[in-house]
């Protein structure tokens, strides 16, 4: 798959990022991961991000990363394209990128470098180095310490033909508009704020109709129903799902830092696809919060295809 073919795929439909399965000892559980991917594939996501932020990329050892990406690529070979999360220092990100390409990933999601303060010129050099290390398509994730502006992204687009996507996790509307207007069709644009559904209508109005869904991990039918309602401008259905599900969901998710991942793993367990515990420094939901989420999911009804 060429980077441009991947860009076309990422320009339409709903995207998601499966959680990574761990066993009771906290080790990668490939059998559980295969079961998860096989369950999610028929629901119709356009692409899946393996070992992304919600997939706890930041907690995986290098050997585990290879297992996760290989398992995802092999399992989804005939069903849905897999993009691999990559990040860390520039040299680490390049190593992960080359490994993901070797294992057959169709593209990369370049996560922000961790903790280290850097100028945005330095961040741009980091992105360029990763792009030039591989031939597959790369999506850059503007979030936290990565805050690339339209000028830098335009420069990167000229230098890196395989930089084909921009994912926004900042929520800076002025910046998003300037990037979208400047870069036009050069990129695919993805909404990437946590619980992106809450912002989906606003981002669609900005020319960003595609987003990645965390709740697809445990209420995939509800996630697809919401996406289709956004796509057809069914404002009544959008409003009802936001009121009935997404706002109460946020009330739980926002109780502790890191719950954006923890609540997804809790939801997967409630749905019958237990992915095990989150790894430290994240913490799992309390028993009370777990029951609150279970009651909320029950209101959404069966999640059959």
Swiss-Prot record:
UniProt KW keywords: Lyase
Pfam family, one: DHDPS
SUPFAM superfamilies, per database record: Aldolase (SSF51569)
EC numbers for this chain: 4.2.1.41
BP GO annotations: D-glucarate catabolic process
InterPro entries (alphabetical): Aldolase_TIM, DapA-like, Dehydro-deoxyglucarate_dehyd
UniProt keyword rRNA-binding present: no
Reactions mediated catalytically: 5-dehydro-4-deoxy-D-glucarate + H(+) = 2,5-dioxopentanoate + CO2 + H2O
GO MF, one example: 5-dehydro-4-deoxyglucarate dehydratase activity
CDD domains: KDGDH (cd00951)
SMART domains (alphabetical): DHDPS
Pathway(s) per entry: Carbohydrate acid metabolism; D-glucarate degradation; 2,5-dioxopentanoate from D-glucarate: step 2/2
Origin superkingdom: Bacteria
PANTHER family registered for this protein in UniProt: 5-DEHYDRO-4-DEOXYGLUCARATE DEHYDRATASE 2-RELATED, DIHYDRODIPICOLINATE SYNTHASE
Family: Belongs to the DapA family.
Name of this chain's protein: Probable 5-dehydro-4-deoxyglucarate dehydratase
Native organism: Pseudomonas entomophila (strain L48)
């Amino acid at each position: 798959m060429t980077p441009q073919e991947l860009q076309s795929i990422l320009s339409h439909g709903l995207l998601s990022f499966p959680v990574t399965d761990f066993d009771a000892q906290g080790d990668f559980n490939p059998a559980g991961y295969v079961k998860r991917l096989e369950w999610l594939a028929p629901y119709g996501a356009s692409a899946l991000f393996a070992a992304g932020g919600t997939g706890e990329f930041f907690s995986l050892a290098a050997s585990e990363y290879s297992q996760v990406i290989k398992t995802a690529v092999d399992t989804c070979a005939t069903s849905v394209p897999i993009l691999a999360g990559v990040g860390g220092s520039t040299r680490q990100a390049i190593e992960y990128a080359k490994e993901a390409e070797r294992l057959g990933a169709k593209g990369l999601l370049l996560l922000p470098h961790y903790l280290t303060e850097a100028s945005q010129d330095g961040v741009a050099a980091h992105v360029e180095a990763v792009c030039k290390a591989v031939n597959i398509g790369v999506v850059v994730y503007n979030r936290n310490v990565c805050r690339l502006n339209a000028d830098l992204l335009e420069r990167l687009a000229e230098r890196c033909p395989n930089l084909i996507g921009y994912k926004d996790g900042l929520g800076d509307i002025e910046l998003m508009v300037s990037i979208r207007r400047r870069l036009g069709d050069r990129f695919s644009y993805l909404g990437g704020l946590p619980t992106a559904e809450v912002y989906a209508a606003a981002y669609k109005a900005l020319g960003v109709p595609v987003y990645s869904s965390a709740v697809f991990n445990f209420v995939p039918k509800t996630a697809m129903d919401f996406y289709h309602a956004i796509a057809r401008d069914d404002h009544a259905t959008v409003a009802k799902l936001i009121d009935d599900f997404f706002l109460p969901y946020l009330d739980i998710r926002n109780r502790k830092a890191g719950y954006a991942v923890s609540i997804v793993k809790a939801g997967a367990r409630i749905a019958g696809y237990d992915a095990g515990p989150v790894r430290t420094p994240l913490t799992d939901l309390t028993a009370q919060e777990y029951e609150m989420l279970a009651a909320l999911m029950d209101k959404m009804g069966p999640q059959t295809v």
